[in-house]
């Protein structure tokens, strides 16, 4: 075998080795890429019910952790949530506006002895069974249910408060609490009082189940253009919240006499 044949065989062998090396390297790169893809967590798609349950448990856990730090405890329920938008208009959805108002009540509270907890602090749908379970765990002194109205006529405007006679506290009846809350909110927003009424609306039935002072307040009407525009603004929501907080403090004073 001459030198030329030897060199030819050498380069052929070398070429084969390079080809095998390239195949091995490419295979390794593809394998590592596959492993990395497998390690990337896949997006978990939760149902509305699962989202609600998770949010409820987190909120309850945090609330229970802080509950014993306060001498007087209030639970506020921002009505509706999640797929249940409540009343709707061009100015917004009831679920969003009342949640914002309720958060402003918590933010405005400066009394370190008063704890204010929300049944929901996010856009999740809760049923009355969950709300009652939350109340059973927290054991508040006062309950405020916050809604909006939407009448069939655009002339409807103002604040309405609903109460139940199923429970009576000699220091503060639900009728008296309803009157306090309406006066406080109307004063804070310089608005209109539509009166206090015994509860009939289905979405407010929770207040009939409680053995503490409790009312449902509809703090405005989305069917009215002027009031609807105001309810959609943060400054006005803060004024509504101020009125609710003032009412809470007056109710506290009555209960502690």
Residues of each region from the PLM?
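N-terminal Sec-pathway targeting helices
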Residues: 1-20
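Hydrophobic single-pass membrane-insertion segments
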Residues: 25-41
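Active-site histidine-acidic residue metal-binding/catalytic motifs
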Residues: 47-134, 138, 157
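Structural recognition of the beta-strand scaffold that forms the well-ordered cores
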Residues: 73-77, 115-119, 142-146, 160-163, ...
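Solvent-exposed loop/turn segments at secondary-structure junctions
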Residues: 81-83, 121-126, 148-153, 167-169, ...
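A short, glycine/acidic-enriched catalytic loop
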Residues: 84-92, 151-180
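Active-site-adjacent mobile loop/cap segments within catalytic or ligand-binding domains
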Residues: 145, 149-152, 195-257
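Active-site-adjacent substrate-binding region
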Residues: 174-199
């Amino acid at each position: 075998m001459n030198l030329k044949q030897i060199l030819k065989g050498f380069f052929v062998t070398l070429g084969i080795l390079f080809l095998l090396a390239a195949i091995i390297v490419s295979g390794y790169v593809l394998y590592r890429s596959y492993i990395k893809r497998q390690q990337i967590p896949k997006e978990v798609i939760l149902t509305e019910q699962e989202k609600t349950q998770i949010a409820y448990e987190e909120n309850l856990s945090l609330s229970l952790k802080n509950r014993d730090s306060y001498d007087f405890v209030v639970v506020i329920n921002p009505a509706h949530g999640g797929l249940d938008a409540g009343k709707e208009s061009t100015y917004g959805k009831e679920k969003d506006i009342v949640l914002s108002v309720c958060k402003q009540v918590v933010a405005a509270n400066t009394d370190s002895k008063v704890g204010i907890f929300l049944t929901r602090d996010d856009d999740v749908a809760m049923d009355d069974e969950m709300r009652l379970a939350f109340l059973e765990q927290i054991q508040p002194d006062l309950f405020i249910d916050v809604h909006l109205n939407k009448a069939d006529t655009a002339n409807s405007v103002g604040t309405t408060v609903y109460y139940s006679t199923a429970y009576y506290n000699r220091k503060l009846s639900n009728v008296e609490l309803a009157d306090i809350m309406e006066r406080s909110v109307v004063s804070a927003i310089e608005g209109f009082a539509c009166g206090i009424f015994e509860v009939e609306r289905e979405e407010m039935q929770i207040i009939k189940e409680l053995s503490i002072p409790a009312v449902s307040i509809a703090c405005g009407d989305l069917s009215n253009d002027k009031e609807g525009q105001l309810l959609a603004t943060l400054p006005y929501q803060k004024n509504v919240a101020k009125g609710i907080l003032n009412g809470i403090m007056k109710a506290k004073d009555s209960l502690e006499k």
